[in-house]
Amino acid sequence: MKDEKTMDKIVSLAKNRGFVFAGSEIYGGLANSWDYGPLGVELKNNVKKLWWKKFVQDNTYNVGLDCAILMNSEVWVASGHLGGFSDPLMDCKECKSRFRADKIVEDYLTEQGAEVASADGWSNEKLENFIKDKHIKCPKCGKENFTSIRKFNLMFKTFQGVTEDASSEIYLRPETAQGIFVNFKNVQRSSRKKVPFGIGQIGKAFRNEITPGNFTFRTREFEQMELEFFCKPGTDLEWFKYWKDYCWSFLLDLGINKENLRFRDHSAEELVFYSKATSDIEYKFPFGWGELWGVADRTDYDLKKHMDHSGEDMNYLDPSTNEKYVPYVIEPSLGADRVALAFLIDAYDEEELEGGDQRIVLHFHPQIAPIKAAVLPLSKKLSEKALDVYSKISSKFNIEYDETGSIGKRYRRQDEIGTPYCITVDFDTLEDEAVTIRDRDSMSQVRVKIEELEKYLEEKIK
């Protein structure tokens, strides 16, 4: 019987095999800071490349953009982030620990087995009353003695230039979306795009989260993959459904187990005031269901706010009808770190083998696997031939070469990092110019001519 898949096992594997390390580890680390190791950076880069291909390159509606992290502070005034981008905080009067009130409520709902454990959109009064009525205790000391809720702004502030005063204050962006909105007219004009069209962007964002956690699920520094899709008012709900289905298929096509995914539509109470509809694709993490991908109908709120604040006209003139309007926006927003974690968790498996043996294997889809194949000489005496095989395919695929240890242990290591194929160079290779290819999932083996190796891998890794 398989053991339960736990976050402790995932974190241990991630560190030991070079997916993710604690940030600044030799100095005691930095809370909730993570560095991607050799395999982790390949995994995340593969996910980003595949997102870009599906959402920008392969979709005729969309183009790409890469905006600056540091922006004029007026952007954040107009967007409402400076005035309203905050978390509801409560302090425990006994142990002085600080918590997000909505997270205390959500954790309680999860413990009680609620199907939907969300407190999004709850007022401060509702949060406080719920905590009091349910006698929810401090997660740290177990006492029931909280302060009233107060708001805490999530933006990281710094200064630009040589002086540190109000005139030089700037902020690390808390989302990539606003850079797209302020460039709406630039992109539309220069690319000659007609509505409907979208602008995609991948980039870092920063939020001074009070209660980050669950490994790379919620961090203060993270990477977003966002699309802002501009459409004519009245067609927005049709496009909202289109992008929901598009996002869903992206995850399934890359092998995520459908049973671990669900849509959760936001209730009227949860919706931010400008949103017409919001739906999250949630993944069943070991710690519970968590948001993976948010798809929102933001209406014309963002463009109108920037038009009002900047004085720049954000209206679009339809060349077919001569109708002028501010486009509505559908936003599918995905965290690269969060979805990479979901792929890692979903791929993890502990298999019982014949004879009572066990192996850990990551069943990555070949397209997201960090290493596509490993070249393994059966003996160090075959290194020269094995390196020749490696050189024939390493320019086309991300290939690993390993000649250390028994062939069985090398197979197990490749299973554990999710390598789909192991290419064994044996003494027969010197005679027949063929290699043995072992499949990660079935552990079956086939003999393939070296001259046909590249074609074989191309057909398998697509």
UniProtKB/Swiss-Prot annotation:
The keyword Ribonucleoprotein does not apply. Coiled coil: none annotated. It holds the Pfam family tRNA-synt_2b. GO terms for biological process: glycyl-tRNA aminoacylation. It is found in: Cytoplasm. Keywords: Aminoacyl-tRNA synthetase, ATP-binding, Cytoplasm, Ligase, Nucleotide-binding, Protein biosynthesis. ATP binds at residues 207-209, 217-222, 291-292, 335-338. It comes from the Bacteria. It is an enzyme of class 6 (ligase). PROSITE patterns: AA_TRNA_LIGASE_II. Catalyzes the attachment of glycine to tRNA(Gly). NCBIfam families: glyS_dimeric, PRK04173.1. This is Glycine--tRNA ligase. It comes from Clostridium acetobutylicum (strain ATCC 824 / DSM 792 / JCM 1419 / IAM 19013 / LMG 5710 / NBRC 13948 / NRRL B-527 / VKM B-1787 / 2291 / W).
